[in-house]
């Protein structure tokens, strides 16, 4: 639900899963066949996992990080992992790159540029749940285009500030 001032978008677990399923249908509807999925950790891990299961494709993971200040709302320096993690083999063929959103577009553009330099990748497309109007990168597949740039409150963010002590309090009788 988008707030009246357009600055915040709150997403429930049910909405989140429905959006990932809609993303899967968009990808399937395109008719594009791909060999592997590369998800960006952390935001792309949940969508990547679901898409890996739905399409029955191997899942690789690349860690990225850019949100640093102001409770994670101010983008800082972009860090890309040196290595891509996958169970076997190498990242090769037709790759679907998955993240949760294209915010500024900086992360996706940097990863795409890096992947295009890998000779083992023959084709690359990208998929996200949300893309913002301010993004400098437009993914091949997305579910919602947000004309403004709201902060998206995803359902798993409740764990960002939850520590074991707080979790234990939930189960005290």
Regions found by a protein language model. Name each.
Residues 1-173:
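PRPP-associated nucleotide enzymes
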């Amino acid at each position: 639900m988008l707030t009246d001032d357009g600055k915040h978008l709150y997403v429930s677990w049910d909405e989140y899963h429905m959006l990932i399923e809609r993303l899967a249908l968009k990808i399937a509807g395109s008719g594009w066949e791909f060999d592997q999925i590369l998800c960006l950790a952390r935001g792309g891990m949940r969508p990547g996992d679901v898409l890996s299961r739905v399409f029955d494709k191997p899942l690789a993971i690349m860690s990225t990080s850019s949100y640093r200040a102001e409770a994670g709302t101010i983008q800082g320096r972009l860090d890309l992992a040196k290595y891509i993690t996958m169970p076997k083999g190498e990242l090769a063929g037709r790759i679907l790159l998955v993240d949760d959103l294209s915010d500024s577009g900086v992360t996706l553009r940097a990863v795409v540029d890096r992947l295009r330099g890998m000779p083992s990748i023959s084709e690359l497309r990208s998929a996200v749940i949300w893309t913002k109007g301010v993004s400098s990168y437009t993914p091949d597949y997305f579910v919602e285009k947000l004309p403004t740039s709201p902060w998206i409150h995803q359902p798993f963010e409740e764990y960002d500030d939850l520590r074991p002590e707080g979790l234990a309090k939930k189960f005290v009788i």
